[in-house]
Swiss-Prot record:
<comment type="similarity">
    <text>Belongs to the NusB family.</text>
</comment>
<dbReference type="Pfam" id="PF01029">
    <property type="entry name" value="NusB"/>
</dbReference>
<keyword id="KW-0889">Transcription antitermination</keyword>
<dbReference type="InterPro" id="IPR035926">
    <property type="entry name" value="NusB-like_sf"/>
</dbReference>
<comment type="function">
    <text>Involved in transcription antitermination. Required for transcription of ribosomal RNA (rRNA) genes. Binds specifically to the boxA antiterminator sequence of the ribosomal RNA (rrn) operons.</text>
</comment>
<dbReference type="InterPro" id="IPR011605">
    <property type="entry name" value="NusB_fam"/>
</dbReference>
<keyword id="KW-0805">Transcription regulation</keyword>
<dbReference type="GO" id="GO:0031564">
    <property type="term" value="P:transcription antitermination"/>
</dbReference>
<dbReference type="GO" id="GO:0005829">
    <property type="term" value="C:cytosol"/>
</dbReference>
<dbReference type="InterPro" id="IPR006027">
    <property type="entry name" value="NusB_RsmB_TIM44"/>
</dbReference>
<keyword id="KW-0804">Transcription</keyword>
<dbReference type="GO" id="GO:0006353">
    <property type="term" value="P:DNA-templated transcription termination"/>
</dbReference>
<protein>
    <recommendedName>
        <fullName>Transcription antitermination protein NusB</fullName>
    </recommendedName>
</protein>
<dbReference type="GO" id="GO:0003723">
    <property type="term" value="F:RNA binding"/>
</dbReference>
<keyword id="KW-0694">RNA-binding</keyword>
């Protein structure tokens, strides 16, 4: 059985694919989640997160851009952008404590991002959580 952490990692993968230009990724979410063994409640959780990010992508991206220090949104790595989008959505619209969301994002970034990514992600998300 998949965990919420694994479900979030799958959502980051979906957002990553979307960001790389796969605009029809939404048509394949069920297949992708099944392939990653994200099922039942965790599948519902993952779909809720993915659909929530996509439905709120403009305010999510605006919050990220507002808190980037000396960075251009388009220059962010696709993994970092996907992770920031998911975590920002959860901070702004979710029910979890921001510290938990930030920790999850940092852990996901450790798995997918560069060596410097976790610190960067932590800083941006901390600023977003303080400003919400």
């Amino acid at each position: 059985m998949a965990t919420r952490h694994q479900a979030r990692m799958a959502v980051v993968s979906l957002l990553y694919a979307f960001d790389l230009g796969n605009g029809n990724i939404a048509e394949h979410t069920d297949e992708i989640l099944e392939e990653k063994k994200i099922r039942n409640k965790q599948k519902d959780f993952a779909l809720t997160l993915y659909e929530g990010v996509m439905a709120n992508i403009t305010p999510v991206d605006e919050a990220i851009v507002k808190h980037l220090k000396d960075w251009d949104f388009e220059r962010l790595g696709a993994i970092e952008r996907a992770t920031l989008r998911l975590a920002t959505y959860e901070i702004l619209f979710g029910e979890l404590d921001s510290a938990v969301v930030i920790n999850e994002a940092v852990e996901i970034t450790k798995a997918f991002g560069t060596e410097q990514s976790p610190k960067f992600i932590n800083g941006v998300l901390d600023a977003i959580s303080k400003d919400k």
